[in-house]
């Protein structure tokens, strides 16, 4: 019997916490396991365990409970603990590949590669955005010396891996052009869906249970409720939509909810906006399948892919979004694109989708067909498998 290839996944985040990058990592793990890979996940102390995944956590840090995306000063010492945990797993398990997710994961993976394996084990970097660009969206880089420091840290990280798996075309371009990585070391592996994930019927009465009229047009947003993820673009667009059609309702899934709830209350739009807080990822289809239109209000600055768009497509929804390279890569002609990253254009396109339900439905059907043909994880993961095979064969020589 052929030996399973062991992959040590270093995940510098509270996995699993029902948010975008976690959904990508979960999708990858599930798809890789179908190709016979044994995945070990080394991650933070918080987050929840999932059946069927080998998740190993650092020691408990009782005062650190943050689950949402975004930087934190606590991560500096937590990532030191992550290194020691990853090193101990490496010594015990002798993995064939180290797969560092996000920049910190690649950095910790690089330390394990060079300090523990002495360069013997290949390191792959799962790139989900630019570190400096993303920190900029969280207003962490207002002081120039700090920006310079993080840019050079990102540059250093990009010298450590043997291969780069990028979550978007933009990420791939950043890695090749800004950090001068050879093109043959870079593959773009767009987020996928497991095509059976949405094979269920909408729950009867679920819309009413959420306080939404059964006949009301429903626009859904899922994801982190953070400025960097575009939530304020959506919230500020809602009054523009309601000024022209008061029958439209909005369903917002995600967390943290406090700032968004406060802003919705200030705008006086609470009667038409329904917030759920954190939702179990495995219940996500129930919410998408009662919706008519999905919205992605993020402006692409950090090169991040948008896993939510893939889920919207998998549920057969028309998608309103800004006109960016990443959104075009996902949706092609199936997107309802708002020009110039302007909030009023986003509002206009949401109204158009409500007022033209037949055309919007056709776009949703196009999206579902496209995701099944192009973005299923079974198809997307083949490039990752090819890279892993190349690296393990090279290591065996």
Predicted segments with their positions:
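A short helix/loop element that forms part of the nucleotide-sugar donor recognition site in Leloir-type
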Residues: 199-212
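Carbohydrate-associated surface elements
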Residues: 170, 192
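Acidic donor-binding loop of glycosyltransferase active sites
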Residues: 288-304, 317
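Conserved acidic donor-binding segment of nucleotide-sugar-dependent glycosyltransferases
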Residues: 335-344, 352-358
